[in-house]
């Protein structure tokens, strides 16, 4: 009898403990505990493929340029869950290559259609360019540069790298650069988030993370987190929700391995979720596509013969 009572007492104790645990899990405001080791990736992005019938021209095109990673280092990587959610939930160019090495000539090629013989990363004083560029073509353009100390800064400062700010190299638009090439700010305040929330974006926006957040000096995870903090700000903006904004995310060059293949992601309300294109695209394709989206009919340099990305991504 005593043994039976002990068994009953133990069962009652275990039942009471189970009730306590269940109650704690169901308490108001108590969510699941954060994962301690490998967290599951975020669900695929849902801000693409929400509209049909793309416009003939768009009001805004935004570029975000990351740094120095190959396609295989990013796509499928557990270190980049947010980027891969965008690749799965929006559009992905699977055969997109940079133009050359190192960084600077890629930035110049993408914005003017030519490298102009540049083969280094020297500052604007070494490469003054009085040539046409997308900044001039667009009619209104803005560069949002993270960690830049002042407008249109022409030299490196801390984690700001002038070689990643192509507008500073075009001497024929220096006045515009001084006005519209600005420190980016943060997600809680500053030039870019204000332009997004107020609907005052220029037609063309060039967005440059600092040397840590662009993956140049810091980890893939750091860049992935940075994009996760900023891209939802873009897709929640009035201009994106209205269906007149397209975002391109690309990398300037790969890690130096052969082929120079880099990830490029297309985010737009008209791009069906999970769209992939294996067409051969380059930074010149990005320039041509941007010109088309903004209604520009004269293509700069090699953009004139580059493949357009427009139809591949439903733009």
Predicted segments, located by residue:
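Hydrophobic alpha-helical segments, principally membrane-spanning helices and signal/leader peptides
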Residues: 1, 7-8, 52, 237
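Secretory targeting and sorting signals
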Residues: 2-27
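N-terminal pro-sequences and low-complexity stem/linker regions of secreted or lumenal proteins
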Residues: 26-315
């Amino acid at each position: 009898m005593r043994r039976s009572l002990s068994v009953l007492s133990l069962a009652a104790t275990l039942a009471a403990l189970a009730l306590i645990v269940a109650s704690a899990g169901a308490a108001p405001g108590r969510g699941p505990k954060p994962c301690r080791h490998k967290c599951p990736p975020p669900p695929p992005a849902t801000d693409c493929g929400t509209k049909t019938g793309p416009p003939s021209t768009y009001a805004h095109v935004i570029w975000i340029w990351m740094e120095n990673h190959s396609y295989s280092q990013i796509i499928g990587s557990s270190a980049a869950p947010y980027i891969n959610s965008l690749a799965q939930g929006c559009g992905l160019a699977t055969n997109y290559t940079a133009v050359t090495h190192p960084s600077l000539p890629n930035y110049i090629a993408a914005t003017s259609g030519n490298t102009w013989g540049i083969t280094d990363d020297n500052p604007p004083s070494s490469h003054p360019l009085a040539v046409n560029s997308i900044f001039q073509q667009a009619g209104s353009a803005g560069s949002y540069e993270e960690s830049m100390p002042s407008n249109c800064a022409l030299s490196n400062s801390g984690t700001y790298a002038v070689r990643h700010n192509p507008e500073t190299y075009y001497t024929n638009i220096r006045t515009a650069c001084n006005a519209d090439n600005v420190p980016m700010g943060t997600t809680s305040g500053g030039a870019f988030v204000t332009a997004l929330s107020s609907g005052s974006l220029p037609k063309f926006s060039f967005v440059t993370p600092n040397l840590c957040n662009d993956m140049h000096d810091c980890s893939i995870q750091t860049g992935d987190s940075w994009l996760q903090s900023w891209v939802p700000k873009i897709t929640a903006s009035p201009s994106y929700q209205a269906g007149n904004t397209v975002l391109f995310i690309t990398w300037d060059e790969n890690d130096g391995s052969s082929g120079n293949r880099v990830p490029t992601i297309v985010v737009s309300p008209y791009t069906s979720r999970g769209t992939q294109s294996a067409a051969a695209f380059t930074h010149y394709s990005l320039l041509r596509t941007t010109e088309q989206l903004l209604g520009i009919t004269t293509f700069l340099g090699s953009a004139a013969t580059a493949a357009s990305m427009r139809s591949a991504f439903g733009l």
